[in-house]
Amino acid sequence: MTDPFTNPDKTLDAQGLRCPEPVMMVRKTVRQMETGQTLLIIADDPATTRDIPGFCVFMEHELLAQETEQLPYRYLLRKG
């Protein structure tokens, strides 16, 4: 099985940041990306398990994968 988190277009390390900082950093990073590019987000704030999927729905980005069983959490989104 292939790891969906390999070879993202951009990576954002949000470890150590607490709500609302991770989502603010994601938003800032996504603004600088082209439609269709992927972003790997690495975080350790439990609030991201709710906030990142919600951000993707609200901003119409696609959440391609998420791994939240252990720290650090990983999310892969595609800019919509």
From Swiss-Prot:
One annotated GO molecular function: sulfur carrier activity
Domain of life: Bacteria
Gene3D superfamilies reported in the protein's UniProt record: TusA-like domain
InterPro entries per UniProt: Sulphur_carrier_TusA (IPR022931), TusA-like (IPR001455), TusA-like_sf (IPR036868)
One Pfam family this sequence matches: TusA
Keyword Calcium found: no
Entry GO terms, CC: cytoplasm
Active-site residues (renumbered): 19
GO BP: tRNA wobble position uridine thiolation
Primary site of residence: cytoplasm
Keywords carried by this UniProt record: Cytoplasm, tRNA processing
Record bears the keyword Endoplasmic reticulum: no
Pathway per the UniProt entry: tRNA modification
PROSITE patterns, A to Z: UPF0033 (PS01148)
Localization, UniProt: Cytoplasm
Assembly notes: Interacts with IscS.
Function (record text): Sulfur carrier protein involved in sulfur trafficking in the cell. Part of a sulfur-relay system required for 2-thiolation during synthesis of 2-thiouridine of the modified wobble base 5-methylaminomethyl-2-thiouridine (mnm(5)s(2)U) in tRNA. Interacts with IscS and stimulates its cysteine desulfurase activity. Accepts an activated sulfur from IscS, which is then transferred to TusD, and thus determines the direction of sulfur flow from IscS to 2-thiouridine formation. Also appears to be involved in sulfur transfer for the biosynthesis of molybdopterin.
PANTHER family tied to this protein: SULFUR CARRIER PROTEIN TUSA, SULFUR CARRIER PROTEIN YEDF-RELATED
NCBIfam families per the UniProt record, alphabetical: PRK00299.1 (NF001423)
UniProt record similarity statement: Belongs to the sulfur carrier protein TusA family.
Protein name per the record: Sulfur carrier protein TusA
Organism lineage: Bacteria, Pseudomonadati, Pseudomonadota, Gammaproteobacteria, Enterobacterales
